[in-house]
Structure formats: C-alpha cells, structure tokens
C-alpha cells in the first residue's frame, strides 16, 4: 500500500548521493534543457497527416451536435485483455455537455473534464489572502483529522425544495443564498458546513474509516452523496451512497472483490454521474471501473429517495504492466472515459459500447487525474506521472495526448525525487493540472513535487499547442495540492496553490507570487474557490476559509 502522507523529511546523506549522480546533471546530457529535461515530441497536430485526418473527421461529425463519439478500437487496445462482469447496459447516452442542473462544485475538479475547482466570479483589489473562518474536526487513530490527498470538498447551492426536506438544522432550511460545503475527513466523518460562516449545518455522517479522497454530489440536485473510503480500520472497505434527506446509507459496494485482480479495496477517486442515464462511473484501487445504474426513485413530496444499483464491472490486464489500481478520478468526454493506473498506463474506454479504444504503455504510477481540453470537438488530454517505480530519483513524465487516438502531441520529463521504504512519500505530479481559459487560454499549468531537492516544488506553464515553456516558478516546499485558477470580473487570472508546510499562495497568471498566508499544517488536499472564498482542509485537523481580497 502506498501511504499518501505529506511529511517533510530531512535526508542529507541521501541527498548528497542523489545530487552527485551524473544522471541528474542536465547540461550536456541526453536530457539537456535549460530547466526541464525534455524528450519533446513537437506538435503532432501539424506533422502527422493521418492523425490530422482523424481529428478533422471527428471535428466535422461532432462539432455541431453534442453526440457520442463513434470510435473503433485501435491497435494499441490489442495489448489489453479485458472483460465485464455482466452484459448490463448501463450507459446509453454521452455525458451531457452541461454536467449539472444545480450550482456547485459537485465532484473532484468540478466535473467530467476535471479541469478546475472554482465557481462564481472573484473581485480582487488588495491582492491579499486573509483567513475568515476555521472548523476543527475530530481525529482518528493513526490518521488524525482534517483532509488528506485528494480531499477536495464539494459545494452546492441547494434548490429550495431540497433545502426544506433535508435534515438540515432549522436555521438553514430557509436561509437565502444557502451554499453547503460537504467535506470527507480523515477522521471518518463527512461534515456539512455553511459556506458563509463555517458553522455545522447538520449532523455529520460517520463511516468510521478514514476518507482520503473527494466526495461527490448528484448533478441533478438530488439529495445523494457518494463517499469513497480510503483506509480500512473497522468493518469492510468500499464505497457508499447516502441519502441527504436523513443521512441513511442507501448502498455499500465492497472494494474487496473476487472479480478484481488486486486485493486492495480503497476508493480515492471521485464519482461522476450521468444524469441522462441515471448512472454513476468510478474507478477503484482494486483495478476495476464501476458502471452503476442507480435506478433512482425520488419523491420530494414524500421526503423519500432510494436507489437499486445494478453494477457492471470492467477489468483488464495490460502487457508489460503488472500494477493494478485506479487512484485518479476518471475523466469523461461524451462517451469516452479516460483513466490512468498505478503502472502509469492510460486508457480510453467507450462506456456505451463497453470496450477499450486505446491503451498506452505503462511508465510510472499516475494518480493525478487526467484533464480534458475540448478543441473544436476533439478531446485532448493532459497528464503526468509520479516518481515511484523509478526509485528515489527519476522523471515525472508530462504529456499532451490526442484523446481520439492516444498519440503523444508533446512530452516533457521533469527531474525529481521520492522517498521509498515503509512510508513512501512520492515526488512528481500528484496535483491535477489546470488548462487555462480566458486570460489563461493557451496555457496548461503543472505542479511538480520534490523538484531539485527533496522539499522543493515547481509550478510550470506550457503552451498547450507547442509544449514550449511559458513560465516557471520554483517553490521552496513541494505540494500535492492541486492548483486552482481564479478568474476575476476585470478579466484577470490568478492561481491558488497550497504546499506541504501549510503555505497558501496567491500567484499571478504569469507565475509571480503576490501574497501568501500560512494555515498551520500541510495542505495536502485540493481547495475549491467560491467567489471570494478559498475552502481547504489541512492535515492539522481543520477546514479553513480564506478570503481573497
């Protein structure tokens, strides 16, 4: 088991041997670059005519109407052997272009493209971060409280109908502009807080096992909550679905499954719901991808909701990849799901036809979620690996891929380090990247941990088309927390970045530190931004709201 605890280690002897290694001396080596070692594949959009033809066909057919991609399996899919646990047809339609019908941040990084964790528009005048409220969680043995990796909250603006029938405390049942923060904690509880004040809005749900990943809410605004369990401490390990009318558990799906090829049953990934199919999609650390028909029956007048899940499980084996397990949150473009595994292989899976389209070779553990960019109807993917299987030193591989063909558009390799042993703490890419929009359009921003030194970090921006570096920012402390882009009313862009010693940075869109605040403990979790507020959990047992002024 790979424990994700962001601990700062001092390892002078190890660093001495690492820094003297000729494989990490970049000038004059085969990895030469002024900052980043790079095996760059120049933009294949303009160079590979066969790929361009494929892209153009997809654009022509899909650009005008949001409909399922009709893709045939490519030769790389033959490197897979796969099966489904049954022939049940779970998905019949592509994920809708508009993921949700209610305001909120409902899954990790917002939705199927996994591209950002923000909502609303921010007004920034003083360019300063100020703490506004904090909430102290309880603690579990060995894991404490607060939030770990990925640990992003969901935020929802409930419609009045649901607000009235749920088990909210009375003062919140009729509160106007009510937004609720839903946060899974390492103490084994799901907490519910008022976004404005940080006060509890209802009693927590206790699963009695640490929650490391990010919870998810139903995009229809139905009072349904998905919770993945990170660590087994009591009872069985698996994923749970709860009613938010009364907090009751509606379904438990065990992670220890005889159908899987791996005996680790955690769920760190955040689920997605296809509201047109009443269906849910999530990957497990047991190596299975779960297609779940919910069969939801919701009667708000009677204050009742129930589900009758029917599950079809996808399993696979890939040549030259013996590592099973999906820790990232599955990304989806229409009917094509994308995920990476603990070996670093990346797959495209048609969830309607229930078959893989392509599968790229393994490299190294890839836990950061894949981010999708929709370019005129063609999906492009941005992804990166950790430094894990490579040992105590290696390269985080950063890639842009064509989501239709799996071909590499450009690639970078960034040097870094990892701590191995019984308590490994990996370097490389663990935070999920950002594909910019508006004033950040044309940029993709990655956050690399353990760069240059064991404690160092790197924030780096690339041109999405060419892969050329636009800017970089060296950070004194590494970060597993995902970067969030903040867009203002005056058409400016800022970045929010937490790090492993509790610093939260406000950074300009060109990579300059503007302001910072220390929140007292490691920020391993990924924040969300709602208007002027940044909400994030720390390993110090707190949820904290920071105001952007």
Question: Can you say where each PLM-predicted feature lies in the sequence?
Answer:
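Intrinsically disordered, low-complexity serine/threonine-rich segments
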Residues: 12-13, 40-41, 467
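Predominantly extracellular/luminal regions of secreted and cell-surface proteins
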Residues: 95-121
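Intrinsic-disorder/low-complexity peptide segments enriched for small residues
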Residues: 12-13, 22, 33, 248, ...
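Sec-dependent N-terminal signal peptides of Gram-positive bacterial secreted proteins and lipoproteins
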Residues: 2-27
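Intrinsic disorder/low-complexity segments enriched in polar/small residues
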Residues: 3-5, 31-33, 41, 49, ...
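Extracytoplasmic/lumenal domain signature
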Residues: 44-91, 115-267, 272-549
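Sec-dependent signal peptide cleavage junction
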Residues: 18-38, 43
